[in-house]
Structures are given as C-alpha cells and as structure tokens.
A protein has these predicted regions:
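N-terminal accessory segments that position/regulate proteins before the catalytic core
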Residues: 1-175, 181-183
Length: 183
C-alpha cells in the first residue's frame, strides 16, 4: 500500500462518516470472543533486558505536574545526548507501566483504559540509549523489560518512512510506536 492510499484510509477512519459504514457493535468482545492476553506472548527462551525500577530512579527529578504541563512544548530539533537507561525506563513506566494486576486479563497501569483493558503494545526504535544497541525493541510491561527485536539497516530512514515521511521521527534518541490488540 502506498503512502497516499494509507493516508486516505486513515483519513476516512477518522471522519465522522465512518460510523455509517462500520458496525462498531460487532466487536470481538460483543461477539463473545475471549479477551486478548494482558501482554503479547514472548517467544520461549527470548532474551530480555531488565529495566531499572522506580526505586532506582535518581535522575528523573521532582517536577510537579502543573509545572511540567506549563513547560511542555513540541521540539523538532534533538540533542545528540543519549538517553540513559534510567530515563527510558521512566518514560516506559509513565506511558504503559503496570502498578498491579486485577486478574489474568486486566492490569492497573499508570495510564487509564476503559475496563482496565490496556490494548496498547509499545515498540521502540532506539538510536541513542546508553547500554542498548541501536535497534528495535518491544516493551514488556509485566516484567518492566525490553525484548530485542533486531537491528535493521537504515533504521532512521525506515522510522521516518513509518511516520509518513516525518524525518524528525528518526532523529531523536528513541522513537515510541504503539500498536493495539483490540477486543
């Protein structure tokens, strides 16, 4: 599928008219299908990289939410300074971290989700993170760990291409991608 076709399909889905042609009540959940796992299965014997937990974070600081929101801005020019593994661990925990498990199909996380479903899977294109090789990774929130997925050539260019040609996506220390396991 070329970029123009993909853009048009995405645009259609985001328009209000999509409800006229898509029956949103025919979901897997409404049709009685079992829920997906809390985390996509990890291949047996796969190597994992443990991340430092909250008790080890010293470089994250004590900025109040109000102050953080007041300072927030978009930046498209990135420092060449690599992230520390601690900084990456904090960002992953803040965006999808598990605080507890309710039952085998629900978790309590640092972010809200209707019915504790949390369908998101977090993938990373790592360019400059201390202690990690440049490459693709998947975050394992139940373990607070990374699953290495490979080290493709031209990662910066392919990341920008995946972001519909936005070159800045391949220039930061790390780029987050989210996919969903809908139910």
């Amino acid at each position: 599928m070329d970029d123009t076709t993909a853009r048009e399909e995405l645009r259609f889905f985001l328009k209000d008219t999509v409800r006229r042609s898509v029956d949103f009540f025919r979901t897997a959940q409404n049709l009685g299908a079992p829920p997906p796992p809390v985390q996509k299965p990890v291949p047996g014997g796969a190597a994992r990289i443990s991340l430092p937990g909250p008790e080890k974070w010293t470089a994250v600081g004590d900025l109040s939410l109000r102050e953080a929101m007041g300072r927030r801005r978009s930046v498209r020019q990135f420092s060449n300074r690599p992230f520390t593994l601690e900084e990456l661990a904090f960002l992953l925990w803040a965006t999808q971290g598990v605080r507890g498990e309710s039952d085998p199909v629900r978790t309590y996380r640092t972010v809200p989700s209707a019915g504790c479903r949390h369908p998101f899977e977090t993938y990373l294109a790592v360019f400059r993170v201390e202690g990690l090789e440049k490459g693709l990774y998947r975050y394992l929130p139940l373990e607070h760990a990374l699953l290495p997925l490979g080290h493709p050539d031209r990662l910066e260019e392919e990341t920008a291409r995946a972001a519909l040609g936005q070159k800045f996506a391949g220039k930061g220390a790390v780029t987050f991608f989210w996919t969903a396991l809908p139910w």
